[in-house]
Regions:
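Hydrophobic membrane-insertion alpha-helices, especially the h-region
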Residues: 27-46
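Solvent-exposed, non-transmembrane regions of membrane-associated and secreted proteins
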Residues: 41-273
Length: 273
């Protein structure tokens, strides 16, 4: 297990303005915890709406490019962008989640994509990103994104999935791994369980395993602790080879101390391209 000590929360308190700026208060430790991914809900509805509209247009351009050529996502609208930061694309059935995913490089702060769009543009809504200790093709992929109060944008639709009735409405997650600007491999993950946990929750912070059986034992412990599970969770675990965890703040109020974790599993029946 990745060593965790002096556990604290990363706090990113987003205060938006009409100029789309954000003031972030960040408490960091030497060891990463579960990133704070919630935005202040006290902003005016008009400012939040403007933020969402601008972000939505930006993301629609990227999604349109992917739809027009599933193997090349570097062309956005009428402009060409070198989206070398796009390492994957995530889609969750039953939600509006359909986003490119980034991962901080060794020269970036761990929380860089909490306040930067996928192309590196400063933006208070950030973009979904992979935990630095994880990898896009790893056994356990951990992805963070903001929960914006009163909006389904980013991972807002996941915040209440620790409740069984909400969890039951979730569909599969499609994970498209990207290499050199092209979709390299597609993996389908099925929902396994969801938890509401403290920000310093240690159990989810495992990124490698000694064996498949070790991974299954870990998943079993998580499923038993979860407040929402798929009906056939034991069967799902028995066939699991990879895990995808999507994480956001439970409350979109800017100072949430709890995280919602939605865990998906796959037998890793990936398709190239």
């Amino acid at each position: 297990m990745y060593p965790v000590r002096n556990l604290e929360t990363w706090e990113a308190l987003g205060t938006m303005s009409a100029h789309y700026s954000v003031k972030s208060i960040l408490h960091t430790t030497a060891t990463s915890c579960l990133a704070v991914v919630c935005l202040v809900g006290a902003c005016s509805a008009g400012i939040i709406s403007a933020q969402v509209d601008v972000y939505d247009l930006h993301m629609r351009g990227l999604m349109g490019a992917l739809a027009s050529n599933a193997s090349d996502i570097q062309v956005t609208g009428q402009e060409a962008h070198h989206n070398s930061t796009v390492v994957a694309w995530v889609n969750v059935d039953g939600t509006q989640i359909n986003y490119p995913v980034a991962q901080p490089t060794s020269t970036m702060a761990d929380d860089y994509y909490l306040h930067h769009a996928i192309d590196g543009t400063p933006h208070s809504l950030g973009c979904p990103y992979i935990d630095r200790r994880s990898s896009k093709d790893g056994q356990h992929v951990v992805v963070y994104a903001h929960h914006l109060a009163s909006s389904p944008l980013l991972f807002g639709e996941l915040a209440n999935r620790y409740q069984q009735d909400a969890f039951d409405k979730l569909g599969n997650a499609t994970w498209r791994s990207v290499e050199d600007g092209k979709v390299d491999r597609t993996t389908i993950f099925q929902p396994l369980c969801a938890l509401r946990v403290p920000a310093s929750y240690e159990a989810i912070q495992r990124f490698s395993f000694t064996s498949i059986e070790d991974m299954k034992a870990w998943l079993t412990e998580l499923a038993r602790e979860a407040s929402a599970c798929t009906e056939n969770w034991q069967t799902a675990i028995s066939g699991a080879r990879r895990v995808l965890s999507l994480i956001t703040c439970t409350e979109g109020n800017g100072h949430s101390m709890r995280r919602t974790i939605v865990i998906f599993v796959s037998g890793d029946q990936s398709e190239a391209g």
